[in-house]
Amino acid sequence: MASSTMALSSPSLAGKAVKLGPTASEIIGEGRITMRKTAGKPKTVQSSSPWYGPDRVKYLGPFSGESPSYLTGEFPGDYGWDTAGLSADPETFAKNRELEVIHCRWAMLGALGCVFPELLARNGVKFGEAVWFKAGSQIFSEGGLDYLGNPSLVHAQSILAIWACQVILMGAVEGYRIAGGPLGEVVDPLYPGGSFDPLGLADDPEAFAELKVKEIKNGRLAMFSMFGFFVQAIVTGKGPLENLADHLADPVNNNAWNFATNFVPGK
């Protein structure tokens, strides 16, 4: 509508502006409010899903007993188990839930980063140092650190410069995840979507709900894996794939029990 008001020629209305409809700014403003309300609504999950609701899968199956009243099966990864009562307070639960999901994502990336370079090195790809906990120390060597073993890719010689780059890049991503940015508005900081979901995996509510469960399950396994990688590095001084190869070659002598008993006093 080119104009929302007009002056009528009738004597009784002469010189008076009569409003025929809402202005463009009002239309746009209302549209924005409606869009935000729609985007902010949680996507519902059908009650037939085995991962949500009161009849969801529990941590001990049919022997799980009664779940705490505050664990209703609303969120992914809720198996009705909270012996320490960490989820009893809603605010604490919301904070811990966000921390868990973020740590899950970092652990999945970290586990892949620990295994993949060593896997490539064992298959003929040349790295300066493929073992994850030894690679970073190469920056203190005389020649510095070459990313992926390629001096023409990224040649790092300053740990402070690496730290600054990490803070800037990770801070920018986290800031956008929480507060939004020029690429779009973020409605849910935990599942921002938009530019963080270029493949549109979250478009279907049912598929998205199942992907949330898969993410939290794989993330919890990844956190345990990272803990195991740290312990292996301290005890054996080897990477995860080398430890796996040693175990498969001699499972009787190369296992967690034998390594643990080496620390028994008097042995």
UniProtKB/Swiss-Prot annotation:
<keyword id="KW-0812">Transmembrane</keyword>
<keyword id="KW-0793">Thylakoid</keyword>
<keyword id="KW-0460">Magnesium</keyword>
<keyword id="KW-0157">Chromophore</keyword>
<feature type="transmembrane region" description="Helical">
    <location>
        <begin position="153"/>
        <end position="173"/>
    </location>
</feature>
<dbReference type="InterPro" id="IPR022796">
    <property type="entry name" value="Chloroa_b-bind"/>
</dbReference>
<keyword id="KW-0148">Chlorophyll</keyword>
<feature type="binding site" description="axial binding residue">
    <location>
        <position position="154"/>
    </location>
    <ligand>
        <name>chlorophyll b 2</name>
    </ligand>
</feature>
<keyword id="KW-0472">Membrane</keyword>
<comment type="subunit">
    <text>The LHC complex consists of chlorophyll a-b binding proteins.</text>
</comment>
<keyword id="KW-1133">Transmembrane helix</keyword>
<feature type="binding site" description="axial binding residue">
    <location>
        <position position="218"/>
    </location>
    <ligand>
        <name>chlorophyll a 4</name>
    </ligand>
</feature>
<feature type="transit peptide" description="Chloroplast">
    <location>
        <begin position="1"/>
        <end position="35"/>
    </location>
</feature>
<feature type="binding site" description="axial binding residue">
    <location>
        <position position="103"/>
    </location>
    <ligand>
        <name>chlorophyll a 2</name>
    </ligand>
</feature>
<dbReference type="GO" id="GO:0046872">
    <property type="term" value="F:metal ion binding"/>
</dbReference>
<keyword id="KW-0809">Transit peptide</keyword>
<dbReference type="GO" id="GO:0009535">
    <property type="term" value="C:chloroplast thylakoid membrane"/>
</dbReference>
<dbReference type="GO" id="GO:0009768">
    <property type="term" value="P:photosynthesis, light harvesting in photosystem I"/>
</dbReference>
<feature type="binding site">
    <location>
        <position position="138"/>
    </location>
    <ligand>
        <name>chlorophyll a 3</name>
    </ligand>
</feature>
<keyword id="KW-0602">Photosynthesis</keyword>
<keyword id="KW-0934">Plastid</keyword>
<keyword id="KW-0150">Chloroplast</keyword>
<feature type="binding site">
    <location>
        <position position="105"/>
    </location>
    <ligand>
        <name>chlorophyll b 2</name>
    </ligand>
</feature>
<comment type="similarity">
    <text>Belongs to the light-harvesting chlorophyll a/b-binding (LHC) protein family.</text>
</comment>
<dbReference type="Pfam" id="PF00504">
    <property type="entry name" value="Chloroa_b-bind"/>
</dbReference>
<feature type="transmembrane region" description="Helical">
    <location>
        <begin position="101"/>
        <end position="121"/>
    </location>
</feature>
<feature type="binding site">
    <location>
        <position position="158"/>
    </location>
    <ligand>
        <name>chlorophyll b 3</name>
    </ligand>
</feature>
<feature type="binding site" description="axial binding residue">
    <location>
        <position position="100"/>
    </location>
    <ligand>
        <name>chlorophyll a 1</name>
    </ligand>
</feature>
<feature type="binding site">
    <location>
        <position position="81"/>
    </location>
    <ligand>
        <name>chlorophyll a 1</name>
    </ligand>
</feature>
<feature type="modified residue" description="N2-acetylarginine">
    <location>
        <position position="36"/>
    </location>
</feature>
<protein>
    <recommendedName>
        <fullName>Chlorophyll a-b binding protein, chloroplastic</fullName>
    </recommendedName>
</protein>
<feature type="binding site" description="axial binding residue">
    <location>
        <position position="232"/>
    </location>
    <ligand>
        <name>chlorophyll a 5</name>
    </ligand>
</feature>
<keyword id="KW-0007">Acetylation</keyword>
<comment type="function">
    <text>The light-harvesting complex (LHC) functions as a light receptor, it captures and delivers excitation energy to photosystems with which it is closely associated.</text>
</comment>
<dbReference type="GO" id="GO:0009416">
    <property type="term" value="P:response to light stimulus"/>
</dbReference>
<feature type="binding site">
    <location>
        <position position="87"/>
    </location>
    <ligand>
        <name>chlorophyll a 1</name>
    </ligand>
</feature>
<feature type="binding site">
    <location>
        <position position="148"/>
    </location>
    <ligand>
        <name>chlorophyll a 3</name>
    </ligand>
</feature>
<feature type="modified residue" description="Phosphothreonine">
    <location>
        <position position="38"/>
    </location>
</feature>
<feature type="binding site">
    <location>
        <position position="263"/>
    </location>
    <ligand>
        <name>chlorophyll b 5</name>
    </ligand>
</feature>
<feature type="binding site" description="axial binding residue">
    <location>
        <position position="174"/>
    </location>
    <ligand>
        <name>chlorophyll b 3</name>
    </ligand>
</feature>
<dbReference type="GO" id="GO:0009523">
    <property type="term" value="C:photosystem II"/>
</dbReference>
<dbReference type="GO" id="GO:0009522">
    <property type="term" value="C:photosystem I"/>
</dbReference>
